[in-house]
Amino acid sequence: MQESKRNFAAFILSHGRADRVYTYNSLRRQGYTGKIYIIVDDQDDQVDLYKQKYPKQVIVFNKAKAWEKVDCGDTIDDMRVVLPARNMCFKIAKKLGLTHFVELDDDYAYFGYRYEQNGALCESRIADMDRIFSAFCDLLDTTPIHTVCFAQGGDTIGGLQSSIWKQKVARKAMNVFICKTDRPFEFFGRINEDTTMYTRLGQEGYLTFTFVALQAHQLATQSNPGGLTDVYCEHGTYLKSFYSVMYSPSCVKIASMGGGGNGKMYRRIHHFVEWKYCTPCIISEKYRKVDAE
């Protein structure tokens, strides 16, 4: 698709944080000049505050109606999660006449670019987000990929020796979702919906990728009140991770992760994806046998 015919916008999903939509300012500071919409639900008691602060940029959806269409994976009567908002994005994009969009959480402090220099993994803040989003839209237009994402700030702990940095491109898909409106997909599970999406759909042949060199840096999950903070504090990471196990038991399991410091071990429960059981394994071209002439 020619860029002149492209209709792109950024969706920031938020709840109860009208005065703390950090992602909005981060996008503007880092060179994004396009349209931004704040996506909130009608059960948010700060809807009017959002509209005051972001006039003509707030889209309110009916959460109860959206909830009827989601697969949350349980019978808990609690809608304090982002799942319905995520699944509404494609519908909202279609209604707005968008061809592409990026879906973001509201707590991104900045977006960085990782690169190798003098034997170390370095980082600079992205200066032209318009160019980044345009390049990813080009990728979606020329491939059957469903979404391409930024890595998380903590993904490359370990620097050049981190396993994900060596991959360059990973099959996971979290945080910054660049999407094509006519290529929809769904999220599943009350929480950990992003992991459940890319593992379950990965088994069905959907293509989701993370470009590791681009990273979104978030505030600590439980340091920013509102959003999903209360849910995470109430249920912990064990329950969070187990939703993905329920949906994809053949390739996701519960494991502990973390490291040590000052002679102590700091570990927490997290999900672990067995990728060889999750997505099709593509053999490198270097192993191709050349036919004898």
Language model: regions and residue ranges:
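Active-site-proximal specificity loops/subdomain of glycosyltransferases
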Residues: D42-V102, A109-L121
